[in-house]
Amino acid sequence: MERVTIESSHRVAIIGDGKLGLLCAQAIALTGASTLLIGKHAEKLRIAERRGIETNKPGTAAKRKREFDVVVEASGSPSGFVGALELLRPRGTLVLKSTFQGPGKIDEVDQARFVVDEISVVGSRCGRFQPALDLLKKGAIDIDSLISEEYPLARGLYAMERAGKRGVLKVLLRPWAN
């Protein structure tokens, strides 16, 4: 998120309530900006709500067209991209945090909006580690709530299988646990 300046006066929406979206929402909320996390999974949205972050399901959020200064697309789905553009105000910034997975097209996107409304599009990867580590050290970002399951290293193969299952956020391997 270092490639975009987010100020406390900004309205920011994050699309996607997976690991990436939850982390982005927490980091953005620290700026003081009005932060909305949009997702489909009640249990994941509750994680953000416990941190004081506003949440919506996609249908409710869709009513807030052209309201946001910055929209972060972290769902990895073409529909997330389309929805992000609909939420963005003219001269807003669309941040792409994930690549699109699986089938689907973004043909429904009104490409003229990028030009007419002067939309900025920013691709954003993981960024520098030290600022992230500093936030973790201060306890500013809650990562414990993102750990769905823990396993000893001896069960590593099973843990890897579990990590790929729907609904599992993060799986933690403890090398010295039994």
Where are these regions (language model features)?
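Mid-domain Rossmann-like dinucleotide-binding core that forms the NAD(H)/NADP(H) cofactor-binding site
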Residues: 1-60
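Rossmann-fold NAD(P)-binding glycine/threonine-rich loop
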Residues: 99-118, 129-134
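C-terminal hydrophobic helical "lid"/dimerization subdomain
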Residues: 82, 128-178
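Helix-to-beta-strand junctions that scaffold the AdoMet/dcAdoMet cofactor pocket
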Residues: 88-90
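Glycine-centered, small-residue-biased loops immediately flanking beta-strands
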Residues: 92-93, 169
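A short acidic, Gly/Pro-enriched loop at the edge of an enzyme's catalytic core
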Residues: 62-71
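Helix N-cap at the beta1-alpha1 junction of Rossmann-like dinucleotide-binding domains, i.e.
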Residues: 42-44, 78, 101-102
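Phosphate-coordination loops involved in phosphoryl transfer and adenosine-cofactor binding
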Residues: 8-11, 68, 118
